[in-house]
Amino acid sequence: MSRHSIKSFSSALFKKPFYVAFFNIIRFFEGPLEILIRYVFETGSYPAKFAVKTPLGLQKISVFSHDDLITLVECFGKQDYVAPEDVSLVVDFGSNIGISALYFLTRNPNVKAYLFEPVPRNVERLKENLKGFETRYEIKEWAIGIKEGRADFASEKTGRYGGLIKDGPSHLSQCPPERRIEVKIQSANKVLREILSKHDSVDILKIDVEGFEAEILAHLEMDVLGRIDRIYAEMTTDQKVPGFLSEHYGGVARYSRV
């Protein structure tokens, strides 16, 4: 049975992230009925292109699997990484095919985004989805961790659930050799310090690095944390971050500066 069966979807509508998603799919997406049917029943062929209304006008987004559609709904429907209208600087660890980046970049015409994504195929798709925004984002093909180096990275077929194999989730170690790539790892603190040498502060730090979110959060040093306003991390654990209040919204831990 579909993971988004009618029964599970109906019960989910009574939880805030999902009724927000339902409302925003109707409000912002062209062809909302098709989106809902694809999302609930996991039907339809891919790749596919969808259009969503944003503060900067209608944007077309290419998705390559049902998993990408889930990401699309998470970003523009559920608004997992909700950004204020006046957001100006975003750092995105784990940018995948650029859906979250497109959400951030379309909040207003002045947003600057620093993007990090180690999988070459994802980067190609990201650049396609972000056409027209090239002057407002920088992309580095790096994985983000707590120290610099190189390591094997599991790159599964959807591109959504890959991650560093060493010390990562156990299922990644089962990735066959043909789906492993060697990637460059950069320290989160070093990357953020370099960005903060050019800017006063980071409005939003988004972390979606398949199992290393908690480790990166614990590794961030106070001189860096003190210049970040919001953090969104794909994790369900109740991890504290000094100087921040936290809440859980679906599968995302949201941190806001005290």
Where are these regions (language model features)?
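Phosphate/nucleotide-binding beta-alpha loop and adjacent structural elements of enzyme active sites
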Residues: 1-258
